[in-house]
C-alpha cells in the first residue's frame, strides 16, 4: 500500500485485541486501531489512518490486522 509506516501485523493473530491495539499504534503512530467483533458491519472505504482489529467473542484477534 502507499500508506506510510508498517501496514500489516500477521503475528498478532491469537493475541488479545487491546494488546494488539497498543502494539499497532506504537509501531505505526500514523494509525488509530479499532477493535471490532467479527461479523460487525463496516464501511468499505480505505483509509491510511485506520487499522481494524477483528476479534472473536473471547476478544482474541482472528485475522491479520492491516491498514484500511
UniProtKB/Swiss-Prot annotation:
Pfam families on file: potato_inhibit
Site (Reactive bond): 44-45
GO molecular function: serine-type endopeptidase inhibitor activity
GO terms (BP aspect): response to wounding
Recorded superkingdom: Eukaryota
Function as written in the Swiss-Prot or TrEMBL entry: Specifically inhibits both trypsin and activated Hageman factor.
Family annotation (PANTHER family): INHIBITOR OF TRYPSIN AND HAGEMAN FACTOR-LIKE (PTHR33091:SF73), PROTEIN, PUTATIVE, EXPRESSED-RELATED (PTHR33091)
Name listed for the protein in its UniProt record: Inhibitor of trypsin and hageman factor
Biological source species: Cucurbita maxima (Pumpkin)
Amino acid at each position: 500500500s502507499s500508506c506510510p509506516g508498517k501496514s500489516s501485523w500477521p503475528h498478532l493473530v491469537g493475541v488479545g485485541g487491546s494488546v494488539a491495539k497498543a502494539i499497532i499504534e506504537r509501531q505505526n503512530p500514523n494509525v488509530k486501531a479499532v477493535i471490532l467483533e467479527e461479523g460487525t458491519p463496516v464501511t468499505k472505504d480505505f483509509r491510511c489512518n485506520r487499522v481494524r482489529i477483528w476479534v472473536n467473542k473471547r476478544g482474541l484477534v482472528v485475522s491479520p490486522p492491516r491498514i484500511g
